[in-house]
Amino acid sequence: MGPQLLGYVVLCLLGAGPLEAQVTQNPRYLITVTGKKLTVTCSQNMNHEYMSWYRQDPGLGLRQIYYSMNVEVTDKGDVPEGYKVSRKEKRNFPLILESPSPNQTSLYFCASSL
């Protein structure tokens, strides 16, 4: 196989797959006051069953807050205290902070999978 053909195969493989597939968090960035309820929405357009919320604090790895295995099916992760979730639609999994506190200052990540 010549270098030109190999380059073509690599480009085809990189371009394969659903390019519109995405997981989004809204809002992307958020600064709030202590005690004011807030909701961060996670949305996915891939019809995935499993969705999860994580937080990452300085010097620590990702820690799971809550996860959902399908609509109306949620369970606690490693650090659920101070958070609530709901899953009324397959594509959305909002994370609710009823009364945010300084110890909840963190990076938050949402994920989905089959």
Swiss-Prot record:
It comes from Homo sapiens. Residues 1-21 form the signal peptide. The keyword Glycoprotein applies. GO terms for cellular component: plasma membrane; T cell receptor complex. Keywords: Adaptive immunity, Cell membrane, Disulfide bond, Glycoprotein, Immunity, Immunoglobulin domain, Membrane, Receptor, Signal, T cell receptor. Its main location: membrane. V region of the variable domain of T cell receptor (TR) beta chain that participates in the antigen recognition. Alpha-beta T cell receptors are antigen specific receptors which are essential to the immune response and are present on the cell surface of T lymphocytes. Recognize peptide-major histocompatibility (MH) (pMH) complexes that are displayed by antigen presenting cells (APC), a prerequisite for efficient T cell adaptive immunity against pathogens. It is found in: Cell membrane. Alpha-beta TR is a heterodimer composed of an alpha and beta chain; disulfide-linked. The alpha-beta TR is associated with the transmembrane signaling CD3 coreceptor proteins to form the TR-CD3 (TcR or TCR). The assembly of alpha-beta TR heterodimers with CD3 occurs in the endoplasmic reticulum where a single alpha-beta TR heterodimer associates with one CD3D-CD3E heterodimer, one CD3G-CD3E heterodimer and one CD247 homodimer forming a stable octameric structure. CD3D-CD3E and CD3G-CD3E heterodimers preferentially associate with TR alpha and TR beta chains, respectively. It comes from the Eukaryota. GO terms for biological process: adaptive immune response; cell surface receptor signaling pathway. Glycans are attached at N103. Pfam families: V-set. InterPro entries: Ig-like_dom, Ig-like_dom_sf, Ig-like_fold, Ig_V-set, TCR_beta_variable. SMART domains: IGv (SM00406). This is T cell receptor beta variable 27.
